A protein has these predicted regions:
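Rhodanese-like catalytic fold shared by cysteine-dependent sulfurtransferases
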Residues: 1-13, 19, 27-62, 67-117
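Conserved beta/loop motifs at nucleotide-recognition and modification sites
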Residues: 22
Length: 117
């Protein structure tokens, strides 16, 4: 079983310099939902696979997905753990976050890592 963090635990750590929230949703899911956890970084799986070296290796990375079974976040977590990162999955993903009534921000569809290159 992959290590997980509960939504309320993450909420109390938002803004913590030692925590990075990594949203691993695919572009179509990112665009469809139109919202994200405040301060999160969006990198789809392909970007994580290609560009994980840009992620901090001295922070806890909390991976957020939107697949009902959590498979997208688990896949990203496993890859990052294999590459030596300290990583956990957000329990319930984005759906769990929203269900708990926790804050979100709206975004534009093009705000991914690929826009930085």
């Amino acid at each position: 079983m992959d290590p997980r963090m509960h939504c309320t635990d993450l909420y109390f750590r938002l803004g913590d310099d030692e925590v990075l929230v990594l949203d691993c949703r695919e572009p179509e899911d990112w665009a469809r939902h139109g919202l994200h956890i405040p301060g999160s970084l969006w990198m789809c799986f392909e970007e994580i696979l290609r560009d994980s070296q840009v992620l901090p290796d001295d922070e806890l990375i909390v991976v957020v997905g939107c697949a009902p079974d959590g498979s997208d976040a688990r896949r990203a977590c496993r890859l990052l753990r294999q590459r030596g990162f300290n990583v956990v999955c957000l329990e319930g993903g984005l759906h769990g976050w929203v269900t708990h009534g926790l804050p979100t921000e709206s975004h534009v569809a093009a705000a991914s890592m690929s826009g930085l290159w």
